Amino acid sequence: MGGVKSKPKELGQRSRSLDDGTGGHHHHTPNPTSFTPNRSPPVEGSRRGTQPNIINAEQALFGGVNSTTNSITSPNRIGILGGVTTFVALYDYESRTASDLSFRKGERLQIVNNTEGDWWLARSLTTGESGYIPSNYVAPSDSIQAEEWYFGKITRRDSERLLLNLENRRGTFLVRESETTKGAYCLSVLDYDNVKGLNVKHYKIRKLDSGGFYITSRTQFSTLQQLVNHYRQHADGLCHSLTDVCPVLKPPTQGLARDAWEIPRDSLRLDVKLGQGCFGEVWMGTWNGTTRVAIKTLKPGTMSPEAFLQEAQVMKKLRHEKLVQLYAVVSEEPIYIVTEYMGQGSLLDFLKGDMGKMLRLPQLVDMASQIASGMAYVERMNYVHRDLRAANILVGDNLVCKVADFGLARLIEDNEYTARQGAKFPIKWTAPEAALYGRFTIKSDVWSFGILLTELTTKGRVPYPGMVNREVLDQVERGYRMPCPAECPDSLHELMLTCWRKEPEERPTFEYLQGFLEDYFTSTEPQYQPGENL
């Protein structure tokens, strides 16, 4: 780890007294490997906290971080009504249409009109040119949101995902809002020692009534900027002095551009065929000659264009960093569905491929927690997926997982599918009340999530091996449940069994599943040791 020294004993004791105000709060990921979720490798552009010219096309253009949930990188919105008219660019942006405005990180912009939601009309104070800009790419000048180290409403778990990257050195840091104390902040710092390896320490930044800030009351600062600068110069009780700002990729824009929803077919180019299913194909493509996207083409007759367009209006409002973002549609047959592009394809193919062989339980559980996070949002929005399985989860670089194809299953008009029997219907993933009586709810999605956990722990094996669909339905009705997969801890199999309870209301919520999986290696399996496969 590049000259890491053991910290002195007294420093360790002082650190424990400072951390989170309660003592030594840190999170350790067992057996850290190169699989550090939520980071993607370089492609183009720039990322906050590093030198320019490093960005991932998938995340930059289609990363799914949103304004309706905790966002990794979006600044808090501040309107121009209060006299704040000058904003600063947080990232580079290349225009995608004639009405867009290109700008560079650090450029100052005057907001002309911010009443149109996700895209604001702005004028560059550098070039004098005007055009539309993505509102989540700018922050008010001289505000905390404009600081490279300020990550806003990022969760504790996401801060750890970002910091626990093997490219980061000891002392890499970020500042975020406290999840537990309103108005307070948290300083998250990457640490390393020979016993725990890489781990993240979290220090609560408390606010004085007079407006100042402190981690320990003997050292107080009038601004957060002064606090950060102080701990850059001296560890002063922290696990390490602050070194680098945590790198983060550009967030996605909300939509492809202003007013780009129902788009002409000729604005899309199908570049590389990625897959084919019962109802259509999936392509990597390009929109408007500028923007990489994924395009799902549906066979004519698969669903009613009118019903699809109505459902798509709901689907496009679902915005969460763990849901694949719906960007645009071609609403005449053959229907095209345009979404963000995920570079590693479906989770099922990923698990069965070369990368799958290298995955161990910490990475698999982290992927499961990301899926549960996306589904917890679906749960909060009172929506239902209806077809949750590894084939409908997409993987980005560095094990970012996102839920795809939510809500589409309801619209399929194929007789063999709607009868819930035959090869086209995913019986093995479907809860009995949904398969037998068509009762699809978020609780039938929870059942499917339990099946998905078996796909993860068996690296993509088909559920109920050796059994045909009809047999599965009969056996499950009689109380049969799949046994614990090889090397899978009993505690994880017990979680699967709770997802497969006969009575839907007795199954856990996705909110519970997310919390259980995020804390799995601290609360449930702290003694985990890697095995041959898991």
UniProtKB/Swiss-Prot annotation:
Superkingdom of source: Eukaryota
Tissue: Widely expressed.
GO molecular function: ATP binding; non-membrane spanning protein tyrosine kinase activity; signaling receptor binding
Name of the protein in question: Proto-oncogene tyrosine-protein kinase Src
Modified residues (Phosphoserine): S17, S34, S67, S74
Catalytically driven reaction(s): L-tyrosyl-[protein] + ATP = O-phospho-L-tyrosyl-[protein] + ADP + H(+)
GO CC, alphabetical: cell junction; cell-cell junction; cytoskeleton; focal adhesion; mitochondrial inner membrane; nucleus; perinuclear region of cytoplasm; plasma membrane
Positions contributing to ATP binding: L274, G275, Q276, G277, C278, F279, G280, E281, V282, K296
SH3 domain segment(s): 82-143
Modified residues (Phosphothreonine): T73, T509
Disulfide bonds: none
GO BP, one annotated term: cell adhesion
Domain SH2: start-end pairs: 149-253
PTM statement from Swiss-Prot or TrEMBL: Myristoylated at Gly-2, and this is essential for targeting to membranes.
Location of the protein in the cell: Cell membrane; Mitochondrion inner membrane; Nucleus; Cytoplasm, Cytoskeleton
Modified residues (Phosphotyrosine): Y185, Y417, Y437, Y520, Y528
Comment on protein domains: The SH2 and SH3 domains are important for the intramolecular and intermolecular interactions that regulate catalytic activity, localization, and substrate recruitment.
Gene: src
Record-annotated membrane-spanning stretches: none
Known role: Non-receptor protein tyrosine kinase which is activated following engagement of many different classes of cellular receptors including immune response receptors, integrins and other adhesion receptors, receptor protein tyrosine kinases, G protein-coupled receptors as well as cytokine receptors. Participates in signaling pathways that control a diverse spectrum of biological activities including gene transcription, immune response, cell adhesion, cell cycle progression, apoptosis, migration, and transformation.
Family from the record: Belongs to the protein kinase superfamily. Tyr protein kinase family. SRC subfamily.
Region described as Disordered: spans on this chain: 1-50
